[in-house]
UniProtKB/Swiss-Prot annotation:
GO MF: ATP binding; heat shock protein binding; unfolded protein binding; zinc ion binding
Source organism: Porphyromonas gingivalis (strain ATCC 33277 / DSM 20709 / CIP 103683 / JCM 12257 / NCTC 11834 / 2561)
Gene behind the chain: dnaJ
The protein's name: Chaperone protein DnaJ
BP GO terms, sorted: chaperone cofactor-dependent protein refolding; DNA replication; protein refolding; response to heat
Keywords: Chaperone, Cytoplasm, DNA replication, Metal-binding, Repeat, Stress response, Zinc, Zinc-finger
């Protein structure tokens, strides 16, 4: 599957599907492509991983929100929580979602799969960073680097949690499977359920000689410089994830994600309104009367615009496609130029004479039509 499909399409649900609808859709698809039902079928196995990846994202409110905002780009190019490049291992999928299959249809989803057991795979916690972006960054997308303090794999035990090679023993409660199985008789017949082993907490092993540096946790505090790409069109408060760059998990689990929260830096000239940009242009009285050309700043430089003779304060000019791109790639906003006329608070004697001459000119006397036009615009603004 060279190109990722839409996750809602993968599960066959609408974009406003409820949690129950997602769970039912995932269960149906996963059973359809389950390896026990399709032994040796690589295509079915890939579909099985794909539906697990889709459910992992859409069943998590935060990941789903990022996916709805950014698409696959908001998940660091892959699904969150361990779906890296082509998906989780089969063992990871069964560990995370296997409880959805318990006692259903004759197979619980936990067959050996070539010798693997359903040991619990822990996940490291997510990290959050706030990244400030200029409008120029937002207009084109940008590469960023952040230095974070986080949990990393223990440098002494390499994440194993033991002081020496033979520092673990197989859990005697679950015999290394990480789960305990219970069989109960119901009117439908014998039902088998599985739950996490209470002794080893799903790991299948007990540490007898913990690492002296990490005390058996398999992690320590370290630093990492993380690089990531922020797509064009993001907005204040939006979030995206960098897959697997959060805290390391205890004893060889799945890393958490780095959650990047977008913060917009104020621009000295432009004001953002959705994907449109607004520039407040202040022109002189003579320019408003005579008309002429002026330059205005844009997101990528400057643009020359024409001021028509008799331009009124509040007139809005539009520069097509000079705004910001949509984060989902659907079109580009415009730049709006809000024209205002500068009225000086004081003038010198020479200017007073010029103003006095204009007062007697019919050209400078307000007309009833002009007043009605202002009245119409004001009423439209109030509606």
């Amino acid at each position: 599957m060279a190109e990722k499909r839409d996750y809602y399409e993968v599960l066959g649900v609408s974009k406003n599907a409820t949690d129950d609808e997602l769970k039912k859709a995932y269960r149906k698809k996963a059973i359809q492509y389950h390896p026990d039902k399709n032994p040796g079928d690589k295509e079915a196995e890939e579909h099985f991983k794909e539906v697990a990846e889709a459910y992992d994202v859409l069943s998590d409110p935060e990941k789903r929100s990022r996916y709805d905002q950014f698409g696959h780009a908001g998940l660091g190019g892959a699904a969150g929580g361990g779906f890296s490049g082509g998906g989780m291992s089969m063992e990871d999928i069964f560990s995370r979602f296997g409880d959805l299959f318990g006692g259903f249809g004759g197979f619980g989803g936990f067959s050996d799969m070539g010798g693997s057991s359903r040991r619990r795979v822990r996940r490291g916690s997510d990290l959050r960073v706030r990244v400030k972006l200029s409008l120029a960054d937002i207009s084109k997308g940008v590469e960023k680097k952040v230095k974070v303090k986080k949990q990393v794999v223990c440098s002494k035990c390499r994440g194993d949690g033991t002081e020496e090679a033979n520092g673990k023993t197989t859990c005697q409660t679950c015999h290394g499977t990480g789960v305990v199985t219970r069989v109960s008789n119901t009117f439908l017949g014998a039902m088998q359920t599985q739950s996490t082993c209470p002794t080893c907490h799903g790991e299948g092993e007990i540490i007898t000689k913990p690492c002296s540096k990490c005390k058996g946790e398999g992690v320590e505090i370290g630093e990492e410089v993380i690089s990531f790409h922020i797509p064009a069109g993001v907005a204040e408060g939006m979030q995206m994830s960098v897959n697997g760059k959060g805290n390391a998990a205890p004893r060889g689990g799945v890393n958490g994600d780095l959650i990047v929260v977008i913060a917009e830096e104020p621009d000295p000239n432009l004001i953002r309104n959705g994907n449109d940009l607004i520039y407040n242009l202040l022109i002189s009285v003579p320019l408003a009367i005579k008309g002429g050309s002026v330059e205005v700043p844009t997101i990528d430089g400057r643009a020359k615009i024409r001021i028509e003779a008799g331009t009124q304060p509040g007139k809005m000019l539009r520069l097509r496609n000079k705004g910001l791109p949509s984060v989902n790639g659907y079109g580009t906003g415009d730049q709006l130029v809000n024209v205002n006329v500068y009225i000086p608070e004081s003038i010198d004697a020479k200017d007073e004479q010029a103003i006095a001459a204009m007062e007697n000119s019919d050209s400078f006397k307000p007309t009833d039509a002009a007043r009605k036009d202002i009245d119409k615009k004001y009423r439209e603004m109030l509606d």
